[in-house]
Design a protein with these regions (language model features):
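A gly/ser-rich beta-alpha-beta helix-loop segment of oxidoreductase catalytic cores
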Residues: 1-20
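Alpha-helix capping at helix-to-loop junctions
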Residues: 7, 21-24, 59, 63
C-alpha cells in the first residue's frame, strides 16, 4: 500500500480496506482506513515519510472465483476478450496465470540466473500531463519518427482531465532502446524498457548515472520529466 502498487488495470486501492501501522514517533500500533492514505497512482501519504511502518493490511476480495473486469488491453487480448465485452471477467486462477506469464516475459518475476530480473521493477512512473503536453509530445514524435508512430502513441485518461503517457514508450522514442547501453554494468532490461537492471557488477553510481541519462534525455526530447517510482535512500536524481 505504500505506493499503491498495481498492474494490468488493477491497483491495491481497489481492494484495500485498512492498514495496520506502527507509529515510530509514539510507538503506537493502530489500524487506519485506506481512505485516509490519499491513495492515487503509485502514491500514498506513507511513501515519502518514515513516520510509520506497515505491519499488516486488510483486503476486500471477491468470493465468486472471478477476476476484476478486464479493462487493460494487453491482458484482455491474451485472454481473448473482445472490445465489445464491456466489464468482461474470467476465472481468477486463469487470469493470475496469464499475468504471471506476462510478467515473466518482461523480466518482472525474479530469477537469479536472469540479469533482466535484477531490478526494482518499473523504475519510472508513467507521467500524468495536460492535453496540451500530449499534443506537443505527439508533434515531436511525428517529426522524429513519422505520423504513424505519433498516431499510435499510448495515451490514457487520468483524473482531472489530464492524460497518462507511457514512460517506456517515451524512453524508447528518445533514443534509449531495451538493453541500453550495450556494455554498461547497469542497463535497461532487454525485456522491459522501464526496468533499470544490474548486470552483475553495477554500483549505486552506475545506476544513478543511467537513470539521469534516461530522465534527462526524455526531458530534452519531449519536455516531459520522468519521476522515479522507487523511494531513494541517501541519494537523489
Amino acid at each position: 500500500p505504500v505506493q499503491n502498487v498495481g498492474a494490468y488495470g488493477v491497483e491495491i486501492a481497489d481492494v484495500l480496506t485498512e492498514v495496520e501501522l506502527y507509529r515510530r514517533d509514539t510507538g503506537v500500533r493502530e489500524w487506519v482506513r485506506s481512505a485516509d492514505l490519499e491513495l492515487s497512482y503509485r502514491y500514498s501519504n506513507l511513501k515519502f515519510t518514515n513516520k510509520a511502518v506497515v505491519l499488516g493490511i486488510r483486503l476486500r476480495l471477491r468470493n465468486d472465483g472471478l477476476s476484476a473486469p478486464l479493462r487493460f488491453g494487453e491482458l484482455a487480448r491474451v485472454l481473448n476478450v473482445s472490445v465489445n465485452e464491456i466489464e468482461a471477467r474470467r476465472l481468477a486462477t486463469t487470469v493470475r496465470a496469464e499475468v504471471l506469464r506476462l510478467r515473466k516475459k518482461k523480466g518482472m518475476v525474479y530469477n537469479p540466473d536472469d540479469h533482466d530480473t535484477w531490478s526494482a521493477g518499473s523504475f519510472f512512473t508513467n507521467p500524468i500531463v495536460s492535453p496540451e503536453v500530449v499534443q506537443h509530445v505527439r508533434t515531436v514524435v511525428e517529426k522524429l519518427h513519422g505520423a504513424d508512430d505519433a498516431a499510435a502513441m499510448p495515451c490514457f485518461d487520468a483524473s482531472g482531465g489530464r492524460k497518462k503517457l507511457s514512460a517506456a514508450w517515451l524512453i524508447e522514442r528518445a533514443g534509449y532502446p531495451k538493453g541500453y547501453p550495450e556494455d554498461g554494468p547497469a542497463r535497461l532490461s532487454t525485456k522491459h524498457t522501464l526496468a533499470l537492471t544490474n548486470r552483475g557488477s553495477a554500483t549505486t553510481e552506475d545506476l544513478v548515472e543511467l537513470a539521469r541519462t534516461v530522465r534527462n534525455g526524455v526531458e530534452k526530447t519531449f519536455g516531459v520529466s520522468l519521476a522515479p517510482e522507487p523511494v531513494w535512500v541517501g541519494v537523489s536524481l
